């Protein structure tokens, strides 16, 4: 059993903790929290609570939440740390991990240079093998890699042009925006293009990003120039070999991200998460070697399976297909067509 500590229990950290706890070959040794809030109160029922340092202990004790120790105590009891702290904090934390000689996974908000490899389970599982420091790429990059990898593998890719309509913030965040505006990123390509190349080496790609006043999901409009001609059926069949890509058909009645998240609720998933990248089959258009499609991305959860697979790769205990199958089985990710 791999002993996994979770430093940071926000949107990603709490989901990774849950996913790790479901695996047969891993155990959660504890989580690090900074505030004795409602999240800490609920989490303390399932996980041991640790704090960044002793100065945080009294606030937790006053709230009636037992503290097991500091992050250094958690490191002592773990073999790897998943650092899901806010963007930029992981870089500060890395010094401690290096000093204590413990493996660590960082999330996509950190710069690629923080790690020895960036990671996506489908496109570059082997690059994280036996590494000490790995970065799981962002939700948007994960989504693009998921659907582009099968196309590159089967047809080859000459060029990708993706427009990313980003959600403004997560559902539980009442501080960020925009609330009543559309906010384009004026840097073209957006940061997603170079980030995608960290897990799909040499890919010729450009991206445009636009923030929209919604909290539910991102939406991508993707245009791909393949190296060889394909049909619409060829493209869809390539995706159907991968469980983490979900085909949404006309008969589903799903035409919005609101309905897409309602589908996740109907699955009965923990936190109503949709780990899969949902591609509207009606949107798939193929003319010769040019492919266009639209996909929806649940930014809170699509990177969660990747974190689990990254752990196995770093400890060299499974190949890609076996690890992905193990993870998918526990998270109830199945081949689905709607």
Swiss-Prot record:
Q: Which residues bind NAD(+)?
A: 11-12, 109, 167, 299
Keywords tagged on the record: Cytoplasm, Glycolysis, NAD, NADP, Oxidoreductase
EC number(s) of the enzyme? 1.2.1.59
Q: How does it assemble?
A: Homotetramer.
> Which family, according to the similarity comment?
Belongs to the glyceraldehyde-3-phosphate dehydrogenase family.
Q: Which GO terms describe its molecular function?
A: glyceraldehyde-3-phosphate dehydrogenase (NAD+) (phosphorylating) activity; glyceraldehyde-3-phosphate dehydrogenase (NADP+) (phosphorylating) activity; NAD binding; NADP binding
Q: Could you name the active-site residues? A: 139 (nucleophile)
Q: Which organism is it from?
A: Thermoplasma acidophilum (strain ATCC 25905 / DSM 1728 / JCM 9062 / NBRC 15155 / AMRC-C165)
Q: What is this protein called?
A: Glyceraldehyde-3-phosphate dehydrogenase
Q: Would you tell me the Gene Ontology cellular component terms?
A: cytoplasm
The listed locations are:
Cytoplasm
* Domain of life of the organism encoding this protein: Archaea
Pathway it belongs to?
A: Carbohydrate degradation; glycolysis; pyruvate from D-glyceraldehyde 3-phosphate: step 1/5
The UniProt entry's GO biological process terms, in alphabetical order, are:
glycolytic process
What coarse category fits the chief subcellular location reported for this protein?
cytoplasm
Which reactions are catalysed by this chain?
D-glyceraldehyde 3-phosphate + phosphate + NADP(+) = (2R)-3-phospho-glyceroyl phosphate + NADPH + H(+); D-glyceraldehyde 3-phosphate + phosphate + NAD(+) = (2R)-3-phospho-glyceroyl phosphate + NADH + H(+)
By its UniProt entry, which InterPro entries does this protein fall under? Answer: GlycerAld/Erythrose_P_DH, GlycerAld_3-P_DH_AS, GlycerAld_3-P_DH_cat, GlycerAld_3-P_DH_NAD(P)-bd, Glyceraldehyde-3-P_DH_2_arc, NAD(P)-bd_dom_sf
The reply on keyword rRNA-binding is no
Instruction: Write one Pfam family the protein is assigned to.
Output: Gp_dh_C
User: What does the entry list as the binding residues for D-glyceraldehyde 3-phosphate?
Assistant: 138-140, 169, 192-193
């Amino acid at each position: 059993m791999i002993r996994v500590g979770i430093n940071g229990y926000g949107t990603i950290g709490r989901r990774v903790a849950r996913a790790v706890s479901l695996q047969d070959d891993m155990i959660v040794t504890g989580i690090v929290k900074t505030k004795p809030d409602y999240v800490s109160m609920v989490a303390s029922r399932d996980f041991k609570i640790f704090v960044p340092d002793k100065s945080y202990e009294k606030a937790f004790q006053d709230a009636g939440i037992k503290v097991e120790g500091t992050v250094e105590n958690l490191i002592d009891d773990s073999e790897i740390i998943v650092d899901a702290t806010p963007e930029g904090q992981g870089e500060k934390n890395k010094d401690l991990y290096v000093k204590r000689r413990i493996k660590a996974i960082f999330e996509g908000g950190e710069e690629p240079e923080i790690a020895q490899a960036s990671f996506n389970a489908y496109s570059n599982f082997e690059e994280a093998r036996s590494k000490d420091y790995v970065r799981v790429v962002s939700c948007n990059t994960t989504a693009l890699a998921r659907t582009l990898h099968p196309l590159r593998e089967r047809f080859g890719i000459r060029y990708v042009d993706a427009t990313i309509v980003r959600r403004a913030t997560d559902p539980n965040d009442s501080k960020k925006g925009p609330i009543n505006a559309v906010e384009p990123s004026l840097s073209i390509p957006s940061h997603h293009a170079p980030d995608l190349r960290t897990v799909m080496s040499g890919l010729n790609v450009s991206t445009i990003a636009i923030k929209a006043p919604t909290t539910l999901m991102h939406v991508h409009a993707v245009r791909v120039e393949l190296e060889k001609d394909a049909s619409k059926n060829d493209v869809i069949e390539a995706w159907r070999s991968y469980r983490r890509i979900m085909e949404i058909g006309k008969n589903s009645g799903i035409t919005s991200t609101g309905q897409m998240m309602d589908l996740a609720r109907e699955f009965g998933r923990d936190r109503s998460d949709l780990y899969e990248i949902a591609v509207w089959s009606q949107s798939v258009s193929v003319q010769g070697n040019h492919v266009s499609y639209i996909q929806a991305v649940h930014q809170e959860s699509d990177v969660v399976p990747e974190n689990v697979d990254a752990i196995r790769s770093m400890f060299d205990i499974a190949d890609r297909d076996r690890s992905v199958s193990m993870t998918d089985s526990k998270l109830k990710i199945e081949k689905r067509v709607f």
